[in-house]
A protein has these predicted regions:
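A bilobed periplasmic-binding-protein/Venus flytrap-type ligand-binding module shared by bacterial periplasmic
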Residues: 151-158, 193-195, 269-284, 289, ...
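N-terminal twin-arginine translocation
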Residues: 13-22, 28-44
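Periplasmic-binding protein-like
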Residues: 148, 206-215, 251-277
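Mature extracytoplasmic/periplasmic domains
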Residues: 276-336
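N-terminal secretory signal peptides
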Residues: 1-16
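Early extracytoplasmic/lumenal segment of secretory-pathway proteins
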Residues: 39-105
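A ligand-binding cleft/hinge motif common to bilobed small-molecule-binding domains
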Residues: 102-107, 233, 239-256
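Extracytoplasmic ligand-binding site segments that recognize negatively charged/polar headgroups
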Residues: 97-219, 224-233
Length: 362
């Protein structure tokens, strides 16, 4: 299947944020998340495929202790590498953690097994907003593991107030020459600002978004993709667009940096558990997914990695610092206005490319 993906920087950013995560986890003292779920024992083993260091320090060992199922984990460095592997006939993996946009593609390629929700009772712990997904209606093939957002990154000392709308970037001259925007993905942000879907392929809506960006272009210092965060860090701009996980790292180094998801909403990424269609131990894979969705285990993983969990029962157990960190949790009303970047199809991608070319040439 030819890929006509919405050209979000998400796959590359995902890899970058996990590379940072791998380094930070290695530097963190080991924490035990042991949780006994009762006398559940079983035979067999699981092979897991995920980003490096993307569970708690003892999550898999604790699962083995409670279930009797041993788990071996292999790691990939990019989502494209993962997709190539799972597309092969001899990968032998039973469970994977994958970015939502690749979940959508694997569903289309019939690479994933239908989940049996009766084997995942802890699905009841999820926030209702995560019980369904536009890229996987009914959660038939995926369960959410961790999530995050894209929003406005800003230098606090340069702004008179915390930005609450994409308009400060897209429809204002207040910070002329001090704005960095993420290239073609800016079309989606303009659509959100105008009240449309980030994934719209409606010609009239795209024309309006393009016209907005052409008017704003003279006030933008650079269209640079994820490098906008570096410009912000270096003091070259005061406003940029970034993923919350990367901005959180920057905020730890510079307390003058802030982050806000606008009231119009933004992009929401998810990483999900899936079971490959060729899995040899789907029952064990279901048990591991359910284990990760347990309230105490979900809380331990989320606080260890400092990423947002879709697990409402887990959030209730987390520290106040975590729960009140708006870089992680922008608020449920804002989350409801966020959406993932989807595959737009060849015609939709071609139309958006044409609109963006006009913006670039203006």
């Amino acid at each position: 299947m030819k890929r006509s993906r919405n050209r979000s920087a998400m796959p590359e950013v995902s890899a970058a944020r996990r590379r940072f995560l791998a380094g930070s986890v290695a530097a963190t003292a080991t924490v035990s998340f042991a949780k006994q779920l009762g006398a559940q024992t079983g035979n067999g083993s699981l092979r897991m495929y995920s980003w490096p260091d993307y569970t708690g320090s003892s999550t898999l060992a604790d699962f083995t202790a409670s279930s009797g199922i041993s788990v071996s984990a292999d790691f990939y460095d990019s989502s494209d590498e993962m997709l190539r592997t799972i597309s092969g006939a001899d990968h032998r993996y039973d469970i994977i953690i994958a970015s939502y946009d690749y979940v959508e593609e694997m569903i289309g390629k019939e690479l994933l097994l239908l989940l049996d929700h009766s084997q995942i009772p802890n699905i009841a712990n999820l926030y209702p907003v995560f019980n369904d997904a536009i890229f996987d209606p009914g959660r038939r093939y995926s369960m959410p593991f961790l999530w995050g957002t894209q929003g406005i990154c800003f230098r606090r000392s340069a702004l008179s107030a915390i930005p609450e709308s994409w308009g400060i970037l897209l429809d204002s001259d207040a910070y002329s020459g001090r704005i960095a925007l993420p290239g073609p993905d800016t079309l989606g942000l303009a659509l959100k600002y105008l009240g449309y879907s980030y994934n719209s392929v409606d010609p009239g809506e795209l024309e309006a978004a393009g016209a907005l960006l052409i008017r704003q272009k003279s006030h933008v210092k650079a269209f640079v993709g994820p490098e906008g965060i570096e410009l912000l860090a270096n003091g070259d701009v005061d406003l940029a667009v970034g993923w919350n996980s990367e901005v959180h790292r920057l905020m730890e180094e510079d307390d003058d940096i802030g982050y806000r998801v606008p009231t119009e909403g933004g992009l929401l990424w998810q990483d999900c558990f899936c079971i490959p269609r060729s899995a040899s131990n789907p029952s064990g894979a279901h048990r591991l997914i359910d284990y990760a969705l347990d309230a105490e285990m979900g809380a331990a993983i989320a606080e260890y990695l400092w990423y947002a969990t879709p697990n409402r029962a887990a959030v209730a157990l987390l520290s106040q610092d975590y729960r009140e960190d708006h870089t992680i949790f922008p608020g449920m009303e804002i989350i409801k206005r966020c959406e993932p970047a989807l595959n737009l199809g060849e015609a939709g991608t071609r139309l958006r490319d044409q609109i963006w070319q006009r913006v670039s040439e203006a």
